[in-house]
């Protein structure tokens, strides 16, 4: 049995991260989505425990101080974090966990004890103009929020060099195909296959018997 992967997807808002995360899970339904904890209020249609674990600030900070968060960050006035228990359990059982997080969270995970099992991918927009167009077209935020997201976008983009792979999302289907290829190949890394050492020992024993 292989070890599970921590698959990190990061991008500035509007670069297609959430859409590609959904497509990746549609492709392989065994990939688990890391359900983050957040102090922000639930939006219409969101369900506690599905999109997020909605908690108050005191409960969130308590989890952080007790070592219960794999990563956490303060974004747009709210706290976000990934509870560590479910992630560790999934990795040990050979299940992949998908993270839709910013560069701060990605950095914390890649510097954690689970770094050997981490795959980090950054999504770049084809242009800043296209990034703004996508934010405006999705009609999810008001003008002030879009302006804040655009202000933050370059800070996010500036950390592209710390990721394992970087994809320019100028065509969603092409980017999806590249993403699947990367995940498939990374699952075959030697570090993800703990049974290989024992297999080679068996090969050595067989070789010695037949020699």
From Swiss-Prot:
Name of encoding gene: gmk
Keywords: ATP-binding, Cytoplasm, Kinase, Nucleotide-binding, Transferase
Record-linked SMART domains: GuKc
Function: Essential for recycling GMP and indirectly, cGMP.
Catalytic reactions on record: GMP + ATP = GDP + ADP
Protein name: Guanylate kinase
Organism encoding this protein: Roseobacter denitrificans (strain ATCC 33942 / OCh 114)
Subcellular location: Cytoplasm
Phylogenetic classification of the source organism: Bacteria, Pseudomonadati, Pseudomonadota, Alphaproteobacteria, Rhodobacterales
Family under the similarity heading: Belongs to the guanylate kinase family.
HAMAP family named in the record: Guanylate_kinase
Ranges in a coiled coil: none
E.C. number(s) listed in UniProt: 2.7.4.8
Stored Pfam families: Guanylate_kin
UniProt GO MF annotations: ATP binding; guanylate kinase activity
